[in-house]
Amino acid sequence: MSYELDPLPYEYDALEPHISEQVLTWHHDTHHQGYVNGWNAAEETLAENREAGEFGSSAGALRNVTHNGSGHILHDLFWQNMSPEGGDEPEGALAERIAEDFGSYEAWKGEFEAAAGAAGGWALLVYDSFSNQLRNVVVDKHDQGALWGSHPILALDVWEHSYYHDYGPARGDFVSAFFEVVDWDEPAARYEQAVELFE
């Protein structure tokens, strides 16, 4: 099996002025494509090693599967949870659960923004299937700090390639801009999926 890069669910300039066409083009076509290529290359190495019975390079390939596979999956989520029609707050069951698990939307958002400021990769809202609750997590790179058994609901990429061209070192401005394009329909669907699977 090989993995492919899906097109963005909107035009490259659709999120302007919050995220520029140039950043989306670089981010999707170069960075995200690189994770897809890296995942495919690592899988090829593993398949060749299994066939040959030689496993000297398998440990490195396994790490590359984790890093690049997680990068591909998280980027897919990132693109899907934004749209030019975004910018509202969540509604319905997800909004109620955020209020239940965090106290309020404002408390969740403040904690999520803190995660985004600290992360060396991603801030994620996840459904923790062990505790049956929503949590914010700080993920470095694509795979360090993830919580086992968690189901991602909302993903924010805070690698520098996501914002530096548009915002320079002002990551907080980029995080604020992200909330102007968040489309809660996809996270709400992912939350409903998690509840069906785990509750």
Curated annotation (Swiss-Prot):
This is Superoxide dismutase [Mn] 2. NCBIfam families: Superox_dis_Halo. Binds 1 Mn(2+) ion per subunit. It is an enzyme of class 1 (oxidoreductase). Its cofactor is Mn(2+). Belongs to the iron/manganese superoxide dismutase family. It holds the Pfam family Sod_Fe_N. One of its GO terms (molecular function) is metal ion binding. InterPro entries: Fe/Mn_Superoxide_Dismutase, Mn/Fe_SOD, Mn/Fe_SOD_BS, Mn/Fe_SOD_C, Mn/Fe_SOD_N, Mn/Fe_SOD_N_sf, SOD_C_sf, Superox_dis_Halo. PROSITE patterns: SOD_MN. Gene3D superfamilies: Fe,Mn superoxide dismutase (SOD) domain (1.10.287.990), Iron/manganese superoxide dismutase, C-terminal domain (3.55.40.20). Keywords: Manganese, Metal-binding, Oxidoreductase. Its EC number is 1.15.1.1. The lineage of its organism: Archaea, Methanobacteriati, Methanobacteriota, Stenosarchaea group, Halobacteria.
